[in-house]
Each structure stands twice: as structure tokens, then as C-alpha cells.
Regions:
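HTH-adjacent hinge/linker in prokaryotic transcriptional regulators
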Residues: 2-19, 47-48, 58-134, 138-139, ...
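Short helix->loop/beta-hairpin flanking segments within DNA-binding domains
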Residues: 19-37
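A short alpha-helical element within helix-turn-helix/winged-helix DNA-binding domains
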Residues: 36-50, 63
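C-terminal all-alpha effector/ligand-binding and dimerization domain
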Residues: 113-259
Length: 259
């Protein structure tokens, strides 16, 4: 009889300054260090983590590169204002009122931030396998892709790629190379494809080169990926959107009741 060997004790193989940055990052993300709060002094951090001055400074530099803290010569390092943002996915299906901007822009303005959407590309393409499956397409079937970059205070916030079946998008503003007033949810309603519900698949991944560059990521942090499939009341998928956000700057808030 073979006796299974015990699993070796887990050990964090990251360098010390990365581990220190991870713990301080958690303090910031959890609100233990709220916006504007001073981080512990170098002496306090040395004592807490049993680390040298140089190691503490390397850890703080990581957080500065991630735009989580700000430090000035002769002043304490502080947690930056408005760094972590909460996204409420349920808002995505809310149509804009006539003449009103896309709800995402309105919500950002309520929090005192300047938000805008940059349309990167509109093209007909063969979508990746997960999008084909989501839209019920066969291998070789094409879809219309609208790529956008969402920015808050001129910093990239989210890379968005939305795919639409050709029979829905053909000869409609979905194929136009300009932004859609009120958002695609409003347009789909006008086209007779009223969004009824959506399904989100959320995962944390290592960023691709495109995502790393588009979001101006500071280092080897994961990105938060959401694949959202939008359905009509009769269950037809009419849109599949891949959304990518910097994992250290955003969280998702879901509200639901028991089935």
C-alpha cells in the first residue's frame, strides 16, 4: 500500500518587498488605510516586517507605480484619493433616457470624476472560441466587434470588446465608426432586440500584451476579466462583451435575491 506524502508547507516565494507591498495594498483596498490617510512611517514598517530601509522603499515604490499611494520629499506617503472604484454590473442594462449620456458616464460624474469613452475600432471579425460559444456561432462565422477604452480622469479604466451577430448588426449604427448615443443597450432596444438579462463570467488573469499596454499597467498584477452575455426575453444571445480592468483598482458589486 502506498501512503500519500503530505503536501509541503506552502511558502510565499515572492521577494520581501513584494510581500510587504501586498499587505499594504490590502490595507488600502479594504479601507483600513482610507483615501488621504498616512501610511505607517518607514521605522514602523521596518519593525512590522523586519525589513531594511531599502526594502521598505522598494515596496512603497511598487504602490506608487500602481497609483495607489503618493509620496513627496519630506512628507508622509499617503493613500491616494478615489483609487478603488466599485462597479455595479446591474447598471449596464439600464437604458439612457432620450438625449441623456450613457449611464456609465452619468454614474462617474456623480462621484466627481471626469469619464469618457474612446472608440478604438469597429470591424467585422472571426471572434475567439469563447465568444463564438456565447453567441451560438459556428467556427468561421463572423461577428461585428466594437472595441472601446473607458477612461476616468484621463487614466485608462477598462478595455471593452463587444461582439454582435452579423444578422443583428448589419446595416445598423453598430457598424458605424462612431460612438452610439445612449449606448448599445438603447440601440438594441430600438432595433427590436430588447436586452432582458445578462450572465457574467468573472475571472482574474495575467494580462495579455494588448491589455498591459492599453491599461498602462504598472507591473505583474492580474487583471479582472468579465465576459458578459446579454440575452433577450426568449433566450437569444445578442451581445457578448469582454471587459478587462486593472485588478488592483476595481471591485464588482452584485446584488441578488435567493432563487
Amino acid at each position: 500500500m502506498t501512503v500519500p506524502m503530505a503536501e509541503p508547507e506552502a511558502h510565499d516565494r515572492r521577494s520581501l518587498h513584494e510581500r510587504i507591498a501586498a499587505d499594504l495594498r490590502d490595507d488600502i483596498m479594504s479601507g483600513e488605510l482610507p483615501p488621504g490617510a498616512n501610511l505607517p512611517s518607514t521605522a514602523q514598517l521596518r519593525s512590522r516586517f523586519d525589513a531594511s530601509n531599502a526594502t521598505i522603499q522598494k515596496a512603497l515604490q511598487l504602490l506608487k507605480d500602481e497609483r495607489l499611494v503618493v509620496g513627496r520629499a519630506g512628507a508622509a506617503v499617503t493613500a491616494r484619493e478615489h483609487r478603488q472604484r466599485t462597479i455595479r454590473p446591474a447598471m449596464s442594462l439600464t437604458p439612457a433616457a432620450p438625449g441623456e449620456p450613457y449611464p456609465w458616464l452619468t454614474e462617474a460624474a456623480k462621484h466627481g470624476t471626469d469619464a469618457r469613452i474612446a472608440l478604438l475600432d469597429v470591424t467585422e471579425t472571426n471572434p475567439p472560441a469563447d465568444i463564438r460559444t456565447a453567441l451560438g456561432l459556428r467556427h468561421g462565422d463572423a461577428a461585428v466587434l466594437r472595441s472601446q477604452l473607458l477612461l476616468i480622469d484621463d487614466e485608462p479604466a477598462e478595455l471593452v470588446k463587444s461582439y454582435y451577430p452579423l444578422d443583428i448588426a448589419r446595416d445598423t449604427p453598430l457598424m458605424d465608426h462612431h460612438r452610439i448615443k445612449g449606448g448599445t443597450s438603447t440601440l438594441l432596444r430600438q432595433l427590436g432586440h430588447t436586452p432582458h438579462h445578462c450572465v457574467d463570467r468573472v475571472s482574474a488573469r495575467v494580462p495579455t500584451q494588448e491589455q498591459f499596454e492599453a491599461l498602462r499597467l504598472p507591473g505583474s498584477l492580474p487583471v479582472l476579466c468579465t465576459l458578459r452575455i446579454v440575452y433577450t426575453a426568449d433566450g437569444r444571445p445578442i451581445e457578448a462583451t469582454a471587459m478587462v480592468k486593472a485588478g488592483h483598482l476595481y471591485e464588482l458589486q452584485y446584488e441578488f435575491a435567493p432563487e
